[in-house]
């Protein structure tokens, strides 16, 4: 690897520390603010230089699109499980821009292992102990069997429900009698299974 200038080394150290502390790389604006640059564009030029030297990879289209590369990946702690926030229409649920933060939770605590966390909103699943504000541990998968509790995307809405398929129609059942099932006709509606619910962390109390 080609040697770094003092400023490049400073930026690389900032990126490493930010990932270690928050699980995410800094934005260009955050780099500029912390290191006293006049604009985010100045930070971008240094990032391009670091990418040319093989220290990082730049992923276009996202403000935190910075990834450590090569030898810089060594000694970096596992960031943990990503907590998924608001999911944009048409984007993969694990896209970096959907990640609010990372939690130090061992994926192997769950069977099958967890790939991400999703914050529960509402009480449609309260009768099986999935409550508003809980963190739902989810195993990434794209198929489900009848009776499984899944994270599903119907059109552009993400929901947690019990899965039932009858022919070309899927019913997503709540575990709360106040909520009617969601009926999805696969002939003319979009349904994506994002994962299987494998555990609950109650209101994030022990994170």
UniProtKB/Swiss-Prot annotation:
Pfam family, one: LexA_DNA_bind
SUPFAM superfamilies found in the cross-reference section: LexA/Signal peptidase, Winged helix' DNA-binding domain
GO biological process: DNA repair; DNA replication; negative regulation of DNA-templated transcription; proteolysis; SOS response
Known EC number: 3.4.21.88
CDD domains assigned to the protein according to its UniProt record, in alphabetical order: S24_LexA-like
Catalytic residues (UniProt): 124, 161
Known DNA-binding region: 28-48
Domain of life: Bacteria
Gene3D superfamilies in the cross-refs: Umud Fragment, subunit A, Winged helix-like DNA-binding domain superfamily/Winged helix DNA-binding domain
GO molecular-function term, one example from the UniProt record: DNA binding
UniProt site positions, description: Cleavage: 89-90
Catalysed reaction, written as an equation: Hydrolysis of Ala-|-Gly bond in repressor LexA
Similarity comment text for this entry: Belongs to the peptidase S24 family.
Functional note: Represses a number of genes involved in the response to DNA damage (SOS response), including recA and lexA. In the presence of single-stranded DNA, RecA interacts with LexA causing an autocatalytic cleavage which disrupts the DNA-binding part of LexA, leading to derepression of the SOS regulon and eventually DNA repair.
Subunit and partners: Homodimer.
Matching HAMAP family: LexA
Entries under NCBIfam families matching the protein: lexA (TIGR00498)
Name by which UniProt lists this protein: LexA repressor
């Amino acid at each position: 690897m080609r040697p770094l200038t003092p400023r490049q080394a400073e930026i690389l150290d900032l990126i490493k520390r930010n990932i270690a502390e928050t699980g995410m790389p800094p934005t260009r604006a955050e780099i500029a603010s912390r290191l006293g640059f006049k604009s985010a564009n100045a930070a971008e030029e240094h990032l391009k230089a670091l990418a040319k030297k093989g220290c990082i990879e730049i992923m276009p289209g996202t403000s935190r699109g910075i990834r450590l590369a090569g030898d810089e990946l060594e000694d970096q702690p596992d960031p943990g499980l990503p907590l998924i926030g608001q999911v944009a229409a048409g984007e993969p649920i694990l896209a970096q821009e959907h990640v609010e933060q990372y939690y130090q939770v061992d994926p192997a605590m769950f069977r099958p292992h967890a790939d991400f966390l999703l914050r529960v909103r509402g009480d449609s699943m309260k009768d099986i102990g999935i409550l508003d504000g809980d963190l739902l541990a989810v195993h990434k998968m794209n198929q489900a069997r009848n009776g499984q509790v899944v994270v599903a995307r119907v059109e552009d809405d993400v929901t947690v429900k019990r899965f039932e398929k009858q022919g070309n129609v899927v019913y997503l059942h709540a575990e709360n009698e106040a909520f009617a099932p969601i009926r999805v006709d696969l002939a003319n509606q979009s349904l994506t299974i994002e994962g299987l619910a494998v555990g609950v962390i109650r209101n994030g109390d022990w994170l």
